[in-house]
Amino acid sequence: MDYVTLGRTGLRVSVAGLGCGGFSQLGLAQGKSEADAIAIIRQALGLGVNLFDTADAYGTEGVLGKAIKSVRREDVVICTKAPFSFSNPHSTSEGIVASLDKSLRQLDTDYIDVYQLHGVPPGAYDHALSDLAPVLLREKEKGKFCYLGITETAPHDREHQTLNRAAQDGVWDVVMVGFHMMHQNARDRVFPLTRANRVGTLLMFAVRNIFSQPERLRSTLRDLAAAGEVPQSFADPPDPLAFLIHDDGASTVPDAAYRFVRHEPGVDVVLFGTGDPAHLRTNIASILKPPLPEPDRAQLSALFGHLVGVGLDAPHLSRPRR
């Protein structure tokens, strides 16, 4: 495993982080048992993963808490998030402390490494900054968590308005950002600011459905070709990203997707989710591979660098927030 320093936190974290939500929720969303989910977490630990991202909304805090009992607490970096109910301009600051305490109980831990506000839309950012952050920072002083973070609502903030501000405000130590081969605008909107201000980054949406389901990729590119957003050659090819798969390049489209984001300047940790032991191994292996060949990266930028908001399907962010 490779490790990096997570922004100004000083935390040494694995470049591959296991996400405990998404469409899999450690396999629980596909009917797997709690024991199976615990086994996935412990397999990840065995492969060198030390950063785990969960949330109240995922229902996996308790599972993560049980799984990490097999290691020393200081050897694991726990990132979790407040309920979505606080990611609106009408939420109250009083309840956020109770939610933090609830996460501590469910994780069965004395402290959380990174506590994040979850999916904050641009219209709620001022409330998050002025009303919620000061309350949470007082709880930080009590030792309940170490660093404060914020995540964007990627499907409904395609221009990264929330993180563009958060990266400059000096309050948030860590941000979670959506970035992938067909949604690249964080390169200009977010990463220069996080790098300049030493804000740690957790990367989401590296693969999701668009790069793991061939028909989803084909249908998306057909629609984009019909709209004139990509060349007509993408209108109906059987394998539209075949140019990435070759002896010196990627082995699969998901492999290409992970390697594309992993080596983007400004990305600290690439989050991935799975409930399948084989997928866990292959995902980590892809994240640890070298960058894609420069001609392939250049072609991805030329073909898709102008696209915004493609492939940002998210189970917990299905409704717009203002």
Task: Locate the predicted segments by residue.
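Short amphipathic alpha-helices and their capping/turn segments at secondary-structure boundaries
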Residues: 1-11, 65-69, 96-107, 189-198
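Short, well-ordered coil/turn segments that N-cap beta-strands
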Residues: 9-16, 47-51, 72-76, 109-113, ...
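N-terminal binding-site loop/beta-alpha segment at the start of enzyme catalytic domains
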Residues: 1-76, 135
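Conserved, mostly hydrophobic/aromatic
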Residues: 6, 18, 37, 44, ...
